[in-house]
From Swiss-Prot:
Organism per entry: Shewanella sp. (strain MR-4)
GO terms, biological process: protein complex oligomerization; protein folding
InterPro entries in UniProt: Chaperone_TorD (IPR023069), DMSO/NO3_reduct_chaperone (IPR020945), HscB_C_sf (IPR036386), TorD-like_sf (IPR036411), TorD/DmsD_chaperones (IPR050289)
Superkingdom of the source species: Bacteria
One cellular component (GO) term of this entry: cytoplasm
Pfam families: Nitrate_red_del
Subcellular location: Cytoplasm
Family: Belongs to the TorD/DmsD family. TorD subfamily.
Keywords attached to this entry: Chaperone, Cytoplasm
Role this protein plays: Involved in the biogenesis of TorA. Acts on TorA before the insertion of the molybdenum cofactor and, as a result, probably favors a conformation of the apoenzyme that is competent for acquiring the cofactor.
Full protein name: Chaperone protein TorD
Length: 209
């Protein structure tokens, strides 16, 4: 594969992860995620040992979502984890993990920083996604953009500063809060995201040095 093909593939993974953190899975999205093309994608991604366990868990949950009730239960899991700000939730905002304040505010420093990154790239958060710019879905989508439009050094700098600096804390919180849910879909998604970011960071470091 050429570097262009590799970066395109990396961008696709970041965009996929972003989309799964951005909103609940509805029936239309489920069809996309369980299509023949998607199954091939999941299988290929799962060949890597560091991704195999979470990918297998994700595939199992998706393939078992055969009723409206099961889909609603997964949507309720998403809501309880990411939309309800309680101690039993895992808020997906960088500010809440990086701010030195005891009670960090949304739309804080990390939001302003991400807004500036988006502005510099002539991008913006879509109007149908009314969330602060430091939402994990926005950050992962922007990393996908960088994969195809920026040098390796710029990608690594953004990954270190805006993702790797807080992702492990977020993932630990997701796993802690998701433990009460039987299918563990979002624990697997969070685990896969962390493993992907760590592997991508290593690859970028090797490419630079």
């Amino acid at each position: 594969m050429s570097n262009v093909d590799i970066n395109h593939a990396r961008a696709l993974v970041y965009q996929l992860l972003s989309s799964l953190f951005a909103r609940e899975i509805d029936e239309q999205r489920l069809k996309q995620l369980t299509s023949e093309q998607a199954q091939q994608f999941w299988t290929q991604l799962g060949y890597a040992p560091e991704f195999s366990a979470p990918v297998a868990s994700i595939q199992k949950v998706l393939n078992d979502l055969t009723s409206d009730e099961a889909l609603l239960e997964l949507a309720a899991d998403y809501c309880g984890l990411f939309l309800v700000g309680t101690k039993y939730s895992a808020s997906p905002y960088a500010s809440l993990y990086l701010s030195p304040e005891e009670e960090p505010l949304l739309f804080g420093q990390q939001h302003q920083q991400m807004s500036e990154f988006l502005h510099q790239s002539k991008l913006q958060v879509q109007s149908h996604f009314p969330e602060p710019a430091d939402h994990l879905a926005v950050i992962l989508a922007y990393m996908g953009h960088l994969a195809c439009h920026s040098e390796d050094a710029a990608q690594l700098s953004f990954l270190n500063t805006c993702i790797d600096s807080w992702l492990a804390k977020f993932v630990a919180k997701v796993i802690e809060c998701d433990s009460q849910h039987s299918n563990g879909f979002y624990s697997a998604l969070a685990t896969l995201t962390l493993a992907w970011v760590q592997q991508d960071k290593q690859q970028l470091e090797q490419a630079i040095h």
